[in-house]
A protein has these predicted regions:
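Ribonuclease/tRNase effector modules and their secretory precursors
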Residues: 1-95
Length: 95
């Protein structure tokens, strides 16, 4: 089984700026949160990347990654309204 890896500094930056971490993504993946895996939309600029679409607390996040022989390197985490609507039917009302 491959393991997940990421940049520790980037993880802290994501925690501060976006309120989410790679650990939360991994937790969601291990508990059935994977919605899809797609090719990176910009294949010319990122030919070796794919994108995980992950459900975290009823919101879809895009997680670009590079797959090596022994590990999967997570690049960043991008919240996506468009993918939330496509895969989860929109943002859930908290009332």
């Amino acid at each position: 089984m491959k393991y997940f890896d990421w940049n520790v500094g980037k993880n802290e930056e994501l925690r501060i700026e976006r309120g989410i971490t790679f650990e939360e993504i991994i937790f969601s993946l291990l508990h059935g949160g994977l919605l899809d895996t797609i090719e990176h939309p910009n294949r010319k600029k990122y030919p070796d990347q794919k994108v995980l679409i992950v459900n975290v607390e009823d919101y879809a996040y895009l997680v670009p990654f590079v797959e090596a022989e022994e590990y999967i390197f997570l690049k960043t985490i991008i919240p996506s309204r468009r993918m939330t609507k496509k895969y989860l039917g929109g943002i859930k009302d908290e009332t």
